[in-house]
């Protein structure tokens, strides 16, 4: 029965990962939200389950901020911060927690730009610690990339350096990237950074890569890539 129980649990987790992935492919954020609400309501979640939920909340908060749903973003952000605190207190996968801490400090800056001078350095420190403690931690490199990408050059940001961090993360994630929304999100961010630094050929190649990994990725297939090719056609 224990084996059966373990199998069921694994299937449940695989189910949510697939549900979130399909929601990302089709921009179905209602399903994404329903999934995280159902997971949040579960009692006695394992640390692993909390971490999985944290990743989906991370995606949802980022989407809320990007779509100017600030009050909703704040609600989920506060919930995630409590989750990070619990997992840190349990000493669970600390490098991952440091990467999420960095990301959530970035989200707080996204919600209130005036906090940047105070929270920006903390976000950078957390990301640096995250990769110092685990050099295979792709999420840590993504945060280093995001910090360089979003920080104005005047304050030390650099899109070229962001690309190096994103590429590092991409190399780490590529072997297990299929079926993972985080990998597709990284490819979009990398393509965007290449386009903004005028490296059109590389941007094109990364967009194509995302569609070879996920031909049904509607955001890239129907919006981003057609707009990109139209803008840069010879």
Give the role of each language-model region.
Residues 178-193, 218-234:
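TPR/TPR-like alpha-solenoid helical repeat scaffolds
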Residues 47-48, 138-139, 170-180, 213-225:
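Boundary/linker segments of alpha-helical solenoid repeat arrays
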Residues 1-10:
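Bacterial N-terminal signal peptides
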Residues 39-42, 87, 129-130, 169, ...:
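Canonical positions in the second alpha-helix
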Residues 15-20, 45-66, 92-111, 136-152, ...:
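Amphipathic alpha-helical repeat scaffolds of TPR domains
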Residues 32-35, 73, 80, 123, ...:
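Single-residue signature of alpha-solenoid repeat helices
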Residues 36-39, 77, 84, 127, ...:
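Hydrophobic/aromatic packing residues within the alpha-helices of TPR/SEL1-like helical repeat arrays
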